[in-house]
Amino acid sequence: MYPSDLRLSMPRRGLLTLAGAFSLLAVTGCGSDRSSTGSTTTETASAGSFPVVIRHALGSTTIKQAPQRIVTIGQGATEALISMGVYPVGVETYAWGADKDGHLPWNREAFEKAGRPLPALFAGGEQLDVEAIAELEPDLILAPWSGLTQKQYDQLTAFCPTVAYEKSAWTTTWDGEIRMVAKALGRPSDGDKVISDLKKTLADTAAQHPHWEATTFSYIYTEGQGTLGIFRPTEQRVALISMLGLTVDPIVDTITANDGSDWALISLENADKLKDSDLIFTFHLDAATKKQVTSQKLYSSIPAIKRDSVVAPTDPQLVTAISMINPLTVPWSLPRLTDLIDQAVAKVTD
């Protein structure tokens, strides 16, 4: 299981066949009139910005005019849209890190602050609810950081232009995702500003904690007995911590990643590779999993684990927030994250 699956969760409804998707097109009529209350956009691009063509891993998508009813799949696209004044009509639901209704807290706060109706929710992941998406009558589907399959993409493009990830599932960089979203809106310069502002926020935080700069770290996860997962420097969790001024343990670059991914699995017998990491960042799905993992002798022998210079939040909302870099999750999570890092760094120097 890829570690980002913890974001996706819940039992899902079965996929429609491609033929079913075509029949949905006839039933829902994506081009039908909608009332003005259905518009997702507070700021639109000029007509001269279109058409826009976006090439991605699953195909090439042409967006003929400024989209008004956008649906998002995966993570990060919703937040990127909101940062540019655009509110999607439908988003993938979350069981881990979301509130009781399935909304991520920072997204709910943004919709409510803007006086916008909350978006419709639908099942994602392997059981992507194509029918529910079609019923929303979208004119654009954005999935730039997702696990969308070719089959799912073909089903969606039967009734709506769909943008997938650049190269492979769950590997789009945080700034690459923002640029893809901005391009789809016909507003690339707005995306550049969002990226610039976000970099400044993180750089300012790093400047306030100069003692972090000499601190090395590894970002790991475990799924049970015998294995250890290590996130690569390009993975968004790791990139976030690096942008705060900490240094990825050089050993991470020597560990071969799984094909087409930004993470690697090693045997716990090789856990001593992390002996020079000052800090360990990780997460646990629940208390039982944490107990199982930390009770393993090889795991607990990692120096950072032994001295407890570990950043391992247990709040699902915080864990989800710091698993990505975007203009909503960063300000929402940064105060709590910086406190946790300070506590862990103090244990290195004790």
Region annotations inferred by a language model:
Residues T72, G76-L81, G191-V252:
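Basic- and aromatic-lined ligand-binding clefts that recognize polyanionic substrates
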Residues M1-M10, G14-T28:
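N-terminal secretory signal peptides
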Residues T78-V130:
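A short, structured surface patch at a secondary-structure boundary
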Residues W96-G102, L148-K151, K167-M180, A214-I241, ...:
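Extracytoplasmic ligand-binding site segments that recognize negatively charged/polar headgroups
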Residues S60, K151-Q225, S323-D350:
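Extracytoplasmic substrate-binding proteins
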Residues L274-D350:
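Structured C-terminal subdomain patch of bacterial secreted/periplasmic proteins
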